């Protein structure tokens, strides 16, 4: 019996298919990532950041779910599953936190995510 052999042409086609499949899967996983982060900072230097438990209480009382609350370099970072949750939380925290705190969207350091968000936001400008 003869064993079937893979020709060079078949090997190239299989490799190209696997490469395309890998690229598609990586693109899909990047596009699905919609995580959003808010940063709470004190306006005045030396002022303490708000208590994470009070922030948790305000968000929970308004039905806003979050992934994590993390202190980092004199600010409090709150991570959400979606930009909609982040926007709702910003509205609630702007109303409930005392004056002297700034609630702002945290810029993502990942360059790929920045480019994808730019393309999503400006897609209506094409054509």
Curated annotation (Swiss-Prot):
It is found in: Cell inner membrane. Residues 1-10 are cytoplasmic. The chain crosses the membrane at residues 11-31. GO terms for molecular function: protein kinase binding. GO terms for cellular component: plasma membrane. The keyword Membrane applies. Its main location: membrane. InterPro entries: Modulator_MzrA, SecD-TM. It is a single-pass membrane protein. Residues 32-127 are periplasmic. Keywords: Cell inner membrane, Cell membrane, Membrane, Transmembrane, Transmembrane helix. Belongs to the MzrA family. Interacts with EnvZ. Modulates the activity of the EnvZ/OmpR two-component regulatory system, probably by directly modulating EnvZ enzymatic activity and increasing stability of phosphorylated OmpR. This is Modulator protein MzrA. It comes from Salmonella agona (strain SL483). The gene is mzrA.
